[in-house]
């Protein structure tokens, strides 16, 4: 399979929620319809995924979004046999992420704050089972090399059909 580089529209959206209640802070932050900041890769050199809990029970979530043109991949009718997403690690050597299907960005329009929950299956009270997982949980992260994430059948089928 050829190497495909993400489009220039990729980037991150984060939501930083201040002064939220102790019992509902995480859910409110995770379920927010919009982010408080967004950066495209052309503007901001790093993207990432993180969740941070401040001492005041304030949560901050950053989600990275990537767009790929997979039209040049020649797949048999039953889809690609294997596919690997490679992301170069920079800082923070811990991981607890899952690659999921998103509806934004596309290859011509960059990421914006309103794209925070542009995740296939998202609704105002979503949980992990509502999303379309493209990988198993990633539990380790290399901060000075490419991290290879094996994409599952759902991702490979979408690569062949989109």
Task: Kindly give the residue locations of the regions a language model identified.
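Flexible, small-residue-rich N-terminal segments that precede or flank a structured functional core
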Residues: 1-72, 105-109, 119-123
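Hydrophobic beta-strand residues in large extracellular and virion-surface proteins
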Residues: 4, 49, 85-87, 97-102
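A near-ubiquitous, low-amplitude feature marking generic local secondary-structure context
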Residues: 47-53, 84-86, 132-142
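Extracellular/lumenal carbohydrate-interaction signature centered on repeated Trp-anchored short motifs
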Residues: 59-60, 70-82, 161
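Stable alpha-helical elements in mature extracytoplasmic
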Residues: 61-64, 79, 151, 155
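A short beta-strand element within beta-rich, extracytoplasmic domains
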Residues: 64-68, 78-91
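Short beta-turn/strand-loop junction motif enriched in small, turn-promoting residues
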Residues: 70-73, 88, 156
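Beta-strand-rich interaction/scaffold domains
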Residues: 90-161
């Amino acid at each position: 399979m050829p190497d495909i580089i993400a489009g220039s529209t990729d980037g991150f959206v984060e939501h930083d929620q201040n002064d939220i209640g102790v019992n509902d802070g995480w859910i409110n932050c995770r379920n927010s319809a919009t982010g408080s900041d967004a950066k495209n890769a052309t503007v901001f050199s790093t993207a990432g995924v993180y969740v941070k809990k401040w001492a005041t029970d304030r949560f901050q979530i950053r989600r990275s979004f990537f767009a790929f043109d997979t039209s040049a991949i020649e797949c048999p009718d039953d889809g690609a046999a294997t596919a690997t997403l490679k992301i170069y690690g920079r800082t923070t050597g811990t991981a607890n992420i899952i690659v999921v299907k998103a509806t934004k960005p596309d290859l011509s329009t960059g990421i914006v704050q309103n794209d925070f929950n542009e995740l296939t299956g998202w609704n105002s009270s979503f949980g992990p089972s509502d999303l379309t997982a493209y990988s198993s949980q990633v539990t380790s992260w290399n901060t000075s090399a490419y991290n290879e994430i094996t994409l599952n059948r759902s991702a490979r089928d979408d690569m062949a059909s989109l």
